[in-house]
Amino acid sequence: EKGFGFISPTDGSKDVFVHFSAIQTPGFKTLDEGQRVEFTIEQGQK
């Protein structure tokens, strides 16, 4: 909806900001609440 959100790592570390442009999936780029994903953390502009 907003084009961004947060991912909660399973190791209990701090939530990670994610922008829809970082989602690598064919078609509409969306994630559902509770959906399990794999991710790599990269430093970007704020």
Swiss-Prot record:
State a single Gene Ontology molecular function.
DNA binding
* Keywords for this protein: Activator, Cytoplasm, DNA-binding, Stress response, Transcription, Transcription regulation
Q: Which GO terms describe its cellular component?
A: cytosol
Q: Give the induction text.
A: In response to low temperature.
Q: Which organism is it from?
A: Aeromonas hydrophila
Name of the protein in question:
Major cold-shock protein
**PROSITE patterns (UniProt xref):** CSD_1, CSD_2
The record, for SUPFAM superfamilies, names:
Nucleic acid-binding proteins (SSF50249)
Assembly and binders? Homodimer.
Question: What InterPro entries would the database entry show?
Answer: Cold_shock_CspA, CSD, CSD_CS, CSP_DNA-bd, NA-bd_OB-fold
Cellular localisation: Cytoplasm
Please give the Pfam families that the UniProt record associates with this protein.
Answer: CSD
Domain CSD, residue spans: 1-46
